[in-house]
């Protein structure tokens, strides 16, 4: 590991909050441009209670990297809470004093991160960059 670099998994944690009482109605997706975008899914007749809630200040990413134009779909929510498909992984920075979430999003926005995520993806038909691989990312964490 490079000097000054830290393992990301020491700073983040999974979040799995479901929309059980249907309190959140804003449905979004995550684009390869690393932003939350309005969902284009047809949700007529869909049970939204199993969708995941993303709270302001949390991240979401799509672990499937196949056919994403060599990019990973990951975004930081800096607006009101939303719901996303349960196929996304939601996580947050445990201690914002140790790692600024906006700094982390800058790191995720680098082309080097996309290349790393694609390289570390596994699978034959559906390549996956899973939670364990994300946690092993090494990045410089400023003091």
What are these regions (language model features)?
Residues 1-19, 140-143:
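Non-catalytic DNA-recognition/assembly elements of restriction-modification systems
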Residues 113-116:
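Periplasmic-binding protein-like
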Residues 82-87, 122-143:
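A short glycine-rich beta-alpha junction/loop motif
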Residues 9-59:
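Sequence-specific dsDNA recognition surfaces
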Residues 75, 120-123:
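Short amphipathic beta-strand starts and helix->beta connectors
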Residues 56, 60-111, 131:
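A short beta-sheet element
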């Amino acid at each position: 590991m490079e000097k000054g670099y830290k393992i990301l998994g020491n700073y983040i944690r999974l979040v799995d909050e479901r929309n059980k009482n249907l309190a959140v109605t804003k449905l979004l997706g995550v684009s390869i441009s690393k932003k939350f975008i309005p969902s284009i899914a047809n949700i007529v007749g869909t049970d939204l209670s199993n969708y995941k809630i993303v709270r302001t200040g949390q991240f979401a990413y799509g672990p499937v990297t196949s056919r994403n134009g060599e990019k990973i779909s990951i975004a930081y929510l800096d607006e009101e809470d939303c719901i996303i498909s349960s196929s996304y992984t939601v996580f947050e920075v445990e201690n914002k004093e140790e790692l600024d979430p906006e700094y982390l999003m800058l790191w995720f926005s680098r082309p080097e991160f996309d290349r790393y995520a694609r390289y570390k993806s596994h699978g034959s038909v559906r390549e996956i960059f899973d939670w364990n691989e994300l946690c092993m990312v090494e990045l410089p964490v400023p003091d």
